[in-house]
Amino acid sequence: MAMIKMSPEEIRAKSQSYGQGSDQIRQILSDLTRAQGEIAANWEGQAFSRFEEQFQQLSPKVEKFAQLLEEIKQQLNSTADAVQEQDQQLSNNFGLQ
């Protein structure tokens, strides 16, 4: 049997860290994409082509990681809701409101 030792509020607070991490990663990727464009305007040749290829291969992986963090945030919030609902249901068994 699973045991969660955090309150729903604590779980929700921790979930925000994942959402913030996702936002930060997306901002970093945006900044790097902009920098990549500036480099592309000033660097030609085979070396840049390889550099660009690596960047293009990496970008979707970084975006996928940001999406995963957002999904974790949502899962934690859903877990917090379930814990809160379960606690409320159990308290009703004792006539508590």
Swiss-Prot record:
Disulfide bonds: none annotated. Disruption phenotype: Significant increased of early and late apoptotic host cells including infected epithelial cells or dendritic cells. InterPro entries: ESAT-6-like_sf, T7SS_ESAT-6-like. Keywords: Coiled coil, Secreted, Virulence. The keyword Coiled coil applies. One of its GO terms (cellular component) is extracellular region. Residues 61-93 form a coiled coil. It is found in: Secreted. Belongs to the WXG100 family. sagEsxA-like subfamily. This is Type VII secretion system extracellular protein A. It comes from Staphylococcus aureus (strain USA300). The lineage of its organism: Bacteria, Bacillati, Bacillota, Bacilli, Bacillales.
